[in-house]
Every structure is written in C-alpha cells, then in structure tokens.
C-alpha cells in the first residue's frame, strides 16, 4: 500500500526532479514548427498513445510513497472504494441506456412482432419450468439440520414439563378424611337425614291405609291394563317401522333401466345435433336481421317520444312517470321489505316484546278492550246473576257486585265438580261437613289415584 512520506523527503525529491529536467532540456535542441490542425492532432494522438506522461507521473511520485502492511482499516477503505466505483459505473451506464437512440426509434411491425414473440416465449418457458419443478421443490426434500432438530426436541420436552407442572398444581389439594371437623360434619348430616326420614315415615304411617279397598284395587287393575295397552301400541308402531318394505325405485333393475334411458337420451341428442349441424346459421349482417333491428329501434324511439310528450311541462320533481324512477322505486320497496323480514326473523320473531306496551297504539287498543270487557261484564251480570240471591240497586257498588258474582260462580262450579267426580269414590258428602274438610279429603284422594 502506498502512503505519503514526510515533508523533508518531498523537498529532496522535488529538487532532484528539477535538476534532471534542466539537464534534459539542455540536451534536447528545440526547433520551431508551424502550428496547424494536423500538428495538433498528431500531438494529441502521441500523448494518448505514448506512455511519456505516465512515466513522468511515476517519476514525480517516486520516493513520495512507501509500502506499508495492510491493516483492517485500509482493507475496509479499499473495499468501499471498489463498491463506490462500481455504483458510479452502473449509474452512468443506466443514464446512458435511458438516453439511447434505440429507445426513441419509432415502433415498426418487426419490432412489435419480436417483442410479442419474446414475451410469449418467456411465458411459455416460465410455465414449462414451473410444471417441471412442481412437487420437486428443495424445501420438501431438505434435510433437518442439527439446530432445527435440537430446537424441536427442546420445545417438545418443555411443553410436556409445563403441562405436568400445571396438572400437579391443580391436584395438589387433597382433603383429609380423618380431620375432626369433617367427621363431625358427616355425623351431623347422617343424624339430620335419619331424623327427616323417620319424620316423613311417621307422617306417612298416620295416613289411613288404602290397601285392600275396592276402588284402590280397581284403580290398580285399570293402570295395569292401560300400561299393557300402551306397551302393545308402542310395540306395534316400532315393528311397523322396522318391517320390510319393497321399494321398486331402489331395485337394481330399475336403476339399470334408468341408466340405460339416460344413455339413450344422450345418444339421441347427439345424433340430432350432428344431423342439424350446419343447417342453421345466424348472420348478423343479413337484410332480415338488419330490418328487424331497425324496426325495434324505431318502436323504442316512438315510445320514448310518447312518454316525453306526456311528461312535457311537468316539474322535474315528479319522477313517477319515468321508467327508471318506477324501477328504482320497486327495487327500493322490495329491498325494504327484505330488510324488514330479515330483522323480524333475527330480532323480533320468538322474543317477547319489551316496549310494545308503551306505544300509543297499544295503549289505545288496551283502553278500548277494557271498556268492551266492562260493558260485556255488566250485561252478563244483569242477564244471568240477577235474581240469584243478590239484589241489584244503584246503591251497590260495581266492585261488591262483581265480588259477590264471582263467589257464587265459584261455589256453583265447586259443588258441581264435587257431586259429579268425587261422590261415590269412598267418601260421603253431607251437608254437615265443612267445605274445607271436603276439599282436603278430595285432594288427598286425587293425589292417591294419580300415584297409583
């Protein structure tokens, strides 16, 4: 590597060079020549061809630089210089290519054809290369390096270790059965359960025995018969579903015949197509087609002019008569109905309306229904309940009359059910027993019958 030398060495070398130049000038005898274009050209050519200037520069720089060992910094500087020179060279080449004359040439048929052929060839070659390399990529056949294999094993072991740690942490708590508080709690729970069981058993034993009574035996027999009937019906239904049914559509003969019919229809269709092939030809430039096309355009223009004359003089805000406005209106209507149905299916259908009772329309309908109910109630009260133990006068309030009417209706229904359903089933209904005792006895019998 060449590096500059100190100042004293430079001065000495310069003095020696000056002395040598003076000696050379003294030796060479100069002759005047006529300066013309040929002489200038010759001088320039000789300067370019000969290496005189190179030798002079070499002699001038001689002893000014000395060779030293390469250091990392010097190597870095050399590499950077090489990269910088390459970047400058590429930049100049790109600038020259962008300003080349070939780019400004007019496109000819041959150049366009050559460009298209080259593009097609590049696409064909790329596709062939892609098809050839499909399924044979290097990534699929790449061997696993030791680092990747080591990382996979470490990840697998770490996942197992963490999973086991979490599992052990969740199962660390184990209850001790020999603790005094647990023993005491179990004993108390057993005592409470025994007491409740005995209490319930005593209540059951206090009830009168119903085993051996005729009505109870009859109910047991009826329940057995009904269970047998239901079991037979269920068995018959299951056997009907599982019984063998002949399905002609699923037979092999029918499927074969159907397949043959399909093949025959395809063959007939192909034969008709081959026979009629070439008989029909649609010519867009035929006189008949052009005549029909002209008539259609004339008719459309006549209709458009009629609509225009009809709507002439009307304001531009009235879009009802125009076909585009009508089509947009119908489309908007259909879209709104579709959106409303979607919202109804998603949000409203199947859900209870929360704010429906707060709307004015609903409140109005509710008020009207209340008035109609009061009117119907008063009419029924005057027609049916009057003369049945209650005097109707203007001094009696509507609330008292309604209360008395409801009590009479409930007593009537209760007595009718009691006489028709419960009487004759082991209980004598007399006028001396209280209504509360009769109702209690009836409820007990009904519960016993349901239990049986």
From Swiss-Prot:
The record's principal subcellular location, in a coarse class, is cytoplasm
Q: Give me the Nebulin repeat coordinates as residue ranges.
A: 29-63, 64-98, 101-135, 138-172, 173-199, 206-240, 263-278, 279-313, 315-349, 352-386, 389-423, 426-452
Q: What's the name of the protein?
A: Nebulette
Among Pfam families, the record links this protein to:
Nebulin
Q: InterPro entries of this UniProt entry?
A: NEBU/NEBL (IPR055297), Nebulin_repeat (IPR000900)
Q: Where in the cell is it found?
A: Cytoplasm
What segments bear the compositional bias annotation Acidic residues? 11-23
Q: Which PROSITE patterns match?
A: NEBULIN (PS51216)
| Annotated organism of origin | Mus musculus
Keyword terms: Actin-binding, Cytoplasm, Repeat
Span list, region Disordered: 1-26
Q: Please give the GO cellular component terms listed in this UniProt entry.
A: Z disc
Role: Binds to actin and plays an important role in the assembly of the Z-disk. May functionally link sarcomeric actin to the desmin intermediate filaments in the heart muscle sarcomeres. Isoform 2 might play a role in the assembly of focal adhesion.
Q: Which GO terms describe its molecular function?
A: actin filament binding
Q: How does it assemble?
A: Interacts (via nebulin repeats 1-5) with DESM (via rod region). Interacts (via SH3 domain) with XIRP2.
């Amino acid at each position: 590597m060449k590096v500059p030398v100190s100042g004293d060495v430079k001065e000495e070398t310069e003095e020696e060079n000056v002395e040598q130049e003076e000696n050379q000038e003294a030796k060479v005898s100069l002759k005047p020549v006529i300066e013309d274009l040929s002489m200038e050209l010759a001088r320039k050519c000789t300067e370019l061809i000969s290496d005189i200037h190179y030798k002079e520069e070499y002699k001038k720089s001689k002893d000014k630089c000395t060779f030293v060992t390469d250091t990392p910094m010097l190597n870095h500087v050399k590499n950077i210089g090489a990269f910088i020179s390459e970047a400058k060279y590429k930049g100049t080449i790109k600038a020259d290519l962008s300003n080349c004359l070939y780019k400004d040439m007019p496109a000819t048929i041959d150049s366009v054809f050559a460009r298209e052929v080259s593009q097609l060839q590049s696409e064909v070659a790329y596709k062939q290369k892609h098809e050839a390399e499909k399924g044979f990529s290097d990534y699929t056949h790449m061997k696993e390096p030791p680092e990747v294999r080591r990382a996979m094993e470490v990840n697998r072991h770490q996942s197992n270790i963490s999973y086991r740690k979490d599992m052990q942490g969740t199962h660390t708590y184990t209850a001790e059965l020999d603790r005094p508080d647990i023993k005491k709690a179990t004993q108390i729970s057993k005592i409470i359960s025994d007491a409740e069981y005995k209490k319930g058993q005593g209540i059951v034993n206090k009830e009168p025995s119903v085993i051996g009574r005729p009505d109870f035996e009859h109910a047991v027999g009826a329940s057995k018969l009904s269970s047998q009937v239901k079991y037979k019906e269920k068995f018959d239904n299951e056997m009907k579903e599982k019984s063998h049914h002949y399905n002609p559509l699923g037979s092999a003969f029918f499927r074969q015949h159907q397949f043959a019919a399909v093949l025959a229809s395809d063959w007939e269709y192909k034969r008709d197509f081959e026979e009629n092939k070439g008989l029909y030809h649609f010519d867009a430039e035929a006189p008949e087609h052009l005549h029909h096309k002209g008539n259609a355009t004339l008719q459309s223009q006549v209709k458009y002019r009629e609509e225009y004359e009809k709507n002439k003089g009307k304001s531009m805000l009235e879009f009802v008569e125009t076909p585009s406005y009508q089509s947009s209106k119908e489309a908007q209507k259909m879209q709104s109905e579709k959106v409303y149905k979607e919202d109804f299916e998603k949000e409203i259908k199947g859900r209870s309306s929360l704010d429906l009772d707060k709307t004015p329309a609903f409140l109005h309908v509710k008020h009207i229904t209340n008035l109609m109910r009061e009117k119907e109630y008063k009419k029924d009260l005057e027609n049916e309940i009057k003369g049945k133990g209650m005097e109707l006068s203007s001094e009696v309030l509507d609330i008292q009359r309604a209360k008395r009417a409801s009590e009479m209706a409930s007593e009537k229904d209760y007595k009718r059910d009691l006489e028709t359903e419960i009487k004759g089933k082991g209980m004598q209904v007399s006028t001396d027993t209280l209504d509360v005792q009769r109702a209690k006895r009836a409820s007990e019998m009904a519960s016993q019958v349901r239990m049986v």
